[in-house]
Amino acid sequence: MFSRDLTIAKYDAELFEAMQQEALRQEEHIELIASENYTSPAVMEAQGSVLTNKYAEGYPGKRYYGGCEYVDVVEQLAIDRAKELFGADYANVQPHAGSQANAAVYLALLSAGDTILGMSLAHGGHLTHGASVSSSGKLYNAIQYGIDGNGLIDYDEVERLAVEHKPKMIVAGFSAYSQVLDFARFRAIADKVGAYLFVDMAHVAGLVAAGVYPNPVPFADVVTTTTHKTLRGPRGGLILARANADIEKKLNSAVFPGAQGGPLEHVIAAKAICFKEALQPEFKAYQQQVVKNAQAMASVFIERGFDVVSGGTQNHLFLLSLIKQEISGKDADAALGKAFITVNKNSVPNDPRSPFVTSGLRFGTPAVTTRGFKEAECKELAGWICDILADLNNEAVIDAVREKVKAICKKLPVYGN
């Protein structure tokens, strides 16, 4: 029998110390990685609940194990809330991650060797959209589209490639593109060549839920997302679709038993909480602020003479090219890290450096907005970053910025009392 008094602190001091240090890092450092955010205590409570004990292969009302009557309630709540949130007729809340949701979509609708048309990783796409190092690029014939000289998707080029290669599926989505996707145009191109349209909205799902970014569900045959990032929930995946009995059946079979075994019901419970939070009026205000903050930061970099890819942002992220400054993303990342500002190095279009070094940085504002930053704080923060980028080896500037970061983080904590 387990005692409820047996805590990690009492049982595993070494592990607890690492966890405490990570908690301190999150409070004292400014988080600008576009794919990161802070979950609510309720989301974390669900992930640490007794639901982690329950195996539940199958779907609500149709399980391969007994004793699933209560996890059925949990999972159905998540399904119903996801459908309401995104205006979908179908939702599968079982994918363990966004990449696994994407893999399930391919498994459901494609055969090995089929042609897919997705955005190049080097131009802002995602590994799972056909990159050669990913299973999506190994199992399928992946054709890639990119951005033009203005940093925008060239839809005429997408259409030309679609007509030339006749893909079975067109993938719309990104990991580093700061503008709004034209889902209607993607739909028209897909219809022209008889392709499925698959939208991966992992980065902008929270914006979509709040109505501050176009909803792809009415246009796509299938939509996937992660449940963290802008959606601010647990790390996990989600598949959505309009009513189509054939596609729904294929998607369910592809997730289980095709790609996964038992679902993680404790994570699904956390997803249910996340969806409920996203249905509240204050979530829309939060997402509106996320975009305002990203635009405020981008404007400062442009004013200071830096190149923002595509000239600005209409969502939660933007890419900063450092080619003109002859600075590597790796070195810039390290210097900012010393000032307690967490970013990620990122390849930029026509990047002369390797993906392990890069010539750019990716910035995102979901996490800083969660802790209360508004435009004024974000502009000030962007100015501090510019000061460091002006001379990566100026330790005095780095030290001064670090003290400012610690002060503003203390003023605007992630988790209050």
UniProtKB/Swiss-Prot annotation:
Pathway: One-carbon metabolism; tetrahydrofolate interconversion; Amino-acid biosynthesis; glycine biosynthesis; glycine from L-serine: step 1/1. InterPro entries: PyrdxlP-dep_Trfase, PyrdxlP-dep_Trfase_major, PyrdxlP-dep_Trfase_small, Ser_HO-MeTrfase, Ser_HO-MeTrfase-like, Ser_HO-MeTrfase_PLP_BS, SHMT-like_dom. (6S)-5,6,7,8-tetrahydrofolate binds at L121, G125, H126, L127, S354, P355, F356. One of its GO terms (biological process) is glycine biosynthetic process from serine. It comes from the Bacteria. Keywords: Amino-acid biosynthesis, Cytoplasm, One-carbon metabolism, Pyridoxal phosphate, Transferase. Belongs to the SHMT family. This is Serine hydroxymethyltransferase 2. It comes from Pseudomonas putida (strain ATCC 47054 / DSM 6125 / CFBP 8728 / NCIMB 11950 / KT2440).
